[in-house]
């Protein structure tokens, strides 16, 4: 039986025997791949252990701790989080077994990232050889992917499932009903991790459309994939619509031509630099007199390049419907792109192993150095500066208690979640809301929604009036200070920085 991409051209197998690496070289390549695997797993765990949770991750922990799956589903149905329930359910069962510590909660992401990297390696290896399979692996370590290997969020799972779907499409029999079933199931499962995973079907649709002929029926895998995505999204649409109605119009990362232009540099932050270095190496290793005619592009490579269309489809979706456009939403494009690059390089350099080996060393070294820098300074991972703010707050806690303050009121919604989680006095941490109840910050509104299911303290101005003398207001905005003065409060700055603290009378 043939794989899904073997219908068009026979050039889908690995390199011929004349271009295969020697057995000894293959052993070294496999050893190198094993070393990279261990390195990224170990360093991801180390980084996970040396940085606190931040806002999004604390939401994951709080939702995992909800009393029942019914409560979890109800909370998501009332816009308590942006994500579908798949990842939350995984974390709920995982955390019941292994606890809620930073390493335990982040470990599934590290494992999913490693699994996805190995799937991409195997896929590229089958289509080319072990050397170029490792190039696909190493290229991904130079993308935004490693960051999500130590974050308790669903993006590593999103990546892994996208890689698995690509592997099933390219490396299993075309007409197998079981292959079609698993392809549809994996794409559907990806949608339970992130709503934008519906876009994973786009490159496969483009592949079949560009090769369609009158009378030709869609492949079983494509039919199964469309059904899998459609059925799961239809089941989850009430949850998605609940969040969309409340937040899409004011979402902070809206689509724009500038944002679209920045997508690929965000997916591969050092991509242009690495490309320049690779081209310099290609010029240095050019061997005159050797044949340079490249074989025809493999169908799998062409499919991989179609993964570049996922952010474009996402831009259209964001403009027409969701108003949400962030690079991490397209992490599912990475497996196809990595395999396409490996296949392209194999076609042009399979008679020049030194060129490919140099590019592998460049990518592997750059990814490893970048990861090692993060290992040395995990504190540099500071989304929106909130982890620095958290450290400043925790240093102030005892001084506030010594001053008799028993109500710690935070104006910053992200800091509120983090302080609530790490404070020695979590029951005293309170988020300040607007008196009119018209909250415009999504980070406030999701906390208000979640507060119906997960205990947290929220105050308005009238609550503050009853406990002003025992309250410390942390990091207030200028608008908040002016509003308090207009309300008749005597505002005094106890600490001016790095985290301002206001006492009230």
Regions found by a protein language model. Give the residues of each.
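Short, intrinsically disordered terminal tails adjacent to the first/last structured region
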Residues: 1-26, 362-363
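Terminal, non-globular segments
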Residues: 27-505
């Amino acid at each position: 039986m043939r794989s899904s991409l073997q219908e068009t051209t026979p050039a889908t197998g690995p390199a011929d025997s004349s271009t295969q690496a020697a057995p000894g070289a293959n052993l070294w390549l496999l050893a190198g791949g094993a070393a990279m695997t261990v390195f990224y797993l170990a360093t991801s765990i180390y980084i996970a252990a040396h940085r606190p949770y931040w806002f999004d991750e604390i939401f994951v922990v709080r939702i995992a701790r909800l009393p029942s799956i019914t409560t979890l589903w109800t909370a998501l149905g009332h816009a308590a989080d942006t994500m579908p329930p798949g990842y939350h359910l995984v974390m709920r069962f995982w955390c019941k077994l292994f606890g809620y510590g930073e390493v335990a909660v982040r470990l599934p992401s590290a494992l999913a990232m490693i699994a996805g990297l190995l799937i991409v390696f195997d896929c590229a290896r089958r289509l080319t050889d072990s050397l170029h399979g490792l190039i696909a692996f190493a290229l991904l370590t130079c993308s935004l992917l490693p960051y999500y290997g130590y974050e308790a969020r669903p993006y590593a799972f999103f990546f892994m499932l996208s890689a698995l779907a690509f592997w099933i499409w390219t490396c299993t029999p075309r007409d197998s009903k079981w292959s079609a079933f698993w392809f549809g199931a994996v794409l559907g499962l990806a949608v339970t991790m992130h709503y934008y995973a519906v876009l994973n079907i786009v490159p496969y649709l483009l592949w079949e459309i560009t090769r369609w002929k009158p009378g030709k029926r869609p492949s079983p895998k494509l039919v199964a994939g469309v059904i899998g995505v459609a059925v799961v999204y239809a089941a989850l649409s009430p949850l998605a619509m609940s969040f969309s109605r409340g937040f899409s119009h004011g979402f902070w990362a809206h689509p724009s031509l500038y944002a679209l232009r920045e997508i690929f540099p965000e997916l591969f932050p050092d991509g242009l630099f690495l490309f320049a270095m690779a081209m310099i190496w290609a010029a240095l290793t050019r061997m005159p007199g050797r044949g340079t005619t490249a074989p025809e592009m493999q169908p799998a490579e062409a499919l991989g390049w179609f993964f570049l269309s996922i952010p474009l489809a996402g831009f259209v979706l964001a403009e027409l419907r969701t108003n949400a456009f962030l690079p991490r939403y397209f992490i599912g494009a990475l497996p196809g792109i990595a395999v396409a690059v490996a296949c392209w390089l194999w076609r042009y350099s399979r008679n020049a192993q030194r060129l490919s080996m140099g590019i592998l060393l460049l990518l592997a070294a750059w990814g490893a150095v970048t990861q090692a820098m993060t290992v040395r300074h995990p504190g540099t991972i500071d989304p929106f500066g909130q982890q620095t703010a958290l450290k400043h707050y925790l240093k102030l806690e005892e001084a506030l208690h010594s001053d008799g303050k028993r109500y710690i009121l935070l104006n910053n919604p992200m800091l509120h979640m983090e302080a609530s989680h790490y404070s020695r006095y979590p029951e005293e941490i309170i988020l300040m809301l607007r008196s009119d109840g018209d909250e415009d910050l999504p980070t406030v509104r999701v906390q208000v929604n979640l507060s119906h299911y997960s205990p947290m303290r929220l105050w308005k101005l009238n609550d503050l009036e009853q406990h002003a003398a025992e309250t410390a207001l942390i990091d207030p905005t200028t608008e908040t200070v002016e509003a308090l003065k207009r309300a008749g409060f005597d505002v005094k700055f106890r600490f001016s920085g790095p985290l301002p603290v206001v006492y009230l009378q």
